[in-house]
């Protein structure tokens, strides 16, 4: 599926915002931020990885391995925010400060997102390569554009 070209400065701006939103996460090892952007470049939802609403933030729930059972991923939180606010994500793009896992990739596809923009994988993230490769396969086979931006170029473009 071809996507209308967006000037690289917009990718950089939106990825910078995902970093700010990632800072809202209480996850001690990896904060992740996501934003959903309409085709006319309007931010329609944000999300960060965190515990469910009303669920008490305790250290043991945010540590491995417990966090894998309790933490809602940033991308899913952004999609849920769309649902809660009555905003359709169909045809939108999602920007994430970390490449979506395969479960989030499936949710992104099912929600009708047309493109995913994230950072290039860094060496420190290589343990996630298998999951990310599955995500890329889901996007490719489902016709969702997947774009990786080198992290060192974000912030260079104003």
Regions found by a protein language model. Give the residues of each.
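Zinc-dependent deaminase catalytic domain
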Residues: 1-158
């Amino acid at each position: 599926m071809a996507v209308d070209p967006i000037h690289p400065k917009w990718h950089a701006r939106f990825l910078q915002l995902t970093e700010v939103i990632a800072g809202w996460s209480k996850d001690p090892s990896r904060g992740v931020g996501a934003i959903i952007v309409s085709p006319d470049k309007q931010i329609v939802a944000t999300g960060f990885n965190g515990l469910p609403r009303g669920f008490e933030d305790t250290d043991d729930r945010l540590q491995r391995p417990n966090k894998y059972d309790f933490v809602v991923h940033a991308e899913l939180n952004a999609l849920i925010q769309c649902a809660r606010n009555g905003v359709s994500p169909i045809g939108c793009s999602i920007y994430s400060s970390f490449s979506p896992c395969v479960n989030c990739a499936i949710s992104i596809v099912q929600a009708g997102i047309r493109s995913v923009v994230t950072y290039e994988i860094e060496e420190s993230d290589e343990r996630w390569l298998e999951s990310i490769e599955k995500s890329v396969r889901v996007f490719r086979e489902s016709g969702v554009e997947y774009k990786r931006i080198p992290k060192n170029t974000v912030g260079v473009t104003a």
